[in-house]
């Protein structure tokens, strides 16, 4: 039975968000680094740093906090395509989340990217997750 690293990222961020923790520690792989870069660029997390611990690399992500209250933003992440059921879409049928307010992360032939980037480049791919 294989590991689903994308589901691990989503679960870690969701659990830290519900538990009102400020940071999340995620095992570092190429896929996780690309997804965390997208989350950082889109403003869902504040800061990311790479941490080495006994020959293993981890990404330590700081969740985005509200200015008025000290709790983190409620970020909803949903895994779509999974190892048992892959979901693919062409660029014209990529769903829009909350009318464009949320993002869809796709795995394409040109790497992992958001739905906006995939539409601009005119390529589809595997729908990894929704974030809003």
UniProtKB/Swiss-Prot annotation:
Gene Ontology CC, one term: chloroplast
PANTHER family: 40S RIBOSOMAL PROTEIN S15A
Provenance organism: Buxus microphylla
Lineage top rank: taxon: Eukaryota
PROSITE patterns the record matches: RIBOSOMAL_S8
Main location, first listed in the record: plastid
GO molecular function terms attached to this record: rRNA binding; structural constituent of ribosome
UniProt name for this protein: Small ribosomal subunit protein uS8c
Biological process terms in GO annotation: translation
Family: Belongs to the universal ribosomal protein uS8 family.
Subunit structure: Part of the 30S ribosomal subunit.
Subcellular location: Plastid, Chloroplast
This protein's UniProt keywords: Chloroplast, Plastid, Ribonucleoprotein, Ribosomal protein, RNA-binding, rRNA-binding
Role, per record: One of the primary rRNA binding proteins, it binds directly to 16S rRNA central domain where it helps coordinate assembly of the platform of the 30S subunit.
Pfam short name (any one): Ribosomal_S8
């Amino acid at each position: 039975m294989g590991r689903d690293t994308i589901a691990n990222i989503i679960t870690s961020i969701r659990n830290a968000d519900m538990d009102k923790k400020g940071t999340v520690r995620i095992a570092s792989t190429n896929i996780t680094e690309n997804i965390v870069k997208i989350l950082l660029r889109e403003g869902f997390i504040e800061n990311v740093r790479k941490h080495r611990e006994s020959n293993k690399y981890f990404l330590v992500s700081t969740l985005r906090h509200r200015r008025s209250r000290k709790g983190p933003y409620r970020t909803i992440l949903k895994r779509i395509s999974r190892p048992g059921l892959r979901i693919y879409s062409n660029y014209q049928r990529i769903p829009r989340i909350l009318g464009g307010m949320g993002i869809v992360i796709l795995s394409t032939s040109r790497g992992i990217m958001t739905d906006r980037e995939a539409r601009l480049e005119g390529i589809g791919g595997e729908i990894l997750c929704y974030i809003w």
